[in-house]
Amino acid sequence: MQAMLPVILILLLPCIALASTATRATPEQLRKCKFQQPWSFLDCYHEKSDFPTYWIVIVGIINILSCTFFSITIYPTFNFGWNSPNALGYPQEPDEHIPLQHIQQPLALVEYENEPQPSLPPAISYFNLTGGDD
């Protein structure tokens, strides 16, 4: 990760050099669009910017590529989810200090086999109810 920092700085040097050599605008020109005056936003919005539009595209592409590279770099460090499906699959073995004969069996609260089963209702045919084979 520390080796990536010099590479990123070297890649950003042309941007800094070109920005510093560009003609500087006066503060009055930079304050054409004021955020505290929303009623003049549309007038300011239609003015041509001094900043070239291709720089915005270049900065966007660099941002997307650097975020992608960063995410691919740190992806193997995450040790959960689909990266390690057996992370929580510990073997379920009884403790050695508890003898097996002392483990109590779960108590059956209701013994369904011993209870009398209700009788099923008699099967009545539809034809018997209507009186024929309508």
UniProtKB/Swiss-Prot annotation:
PTM note: Phosphorylated on serine; O-glycosylated, but not N-glycosylated.
Tree of life domain: Viruses
GO biological process per UniProt: regulation of signal transduction
Family matches, as Pfam families: Adeno_E3_14_5 (PF04834)
Keyword list, A-Z: Early protein, Glycoprotein, Host membrane, Membrane, Phosphoprotein, Signal, Transmembrane, Transmembrane helix
Location in the cell: Host membrane
Protein family per UniProt: Belongs to the adenoviridae E3_14 family.
Function: Down-regulates the EGF receptor and prevents cytolysis by TNF.
Record's protein name: Early E3B 14.9 kDa protein
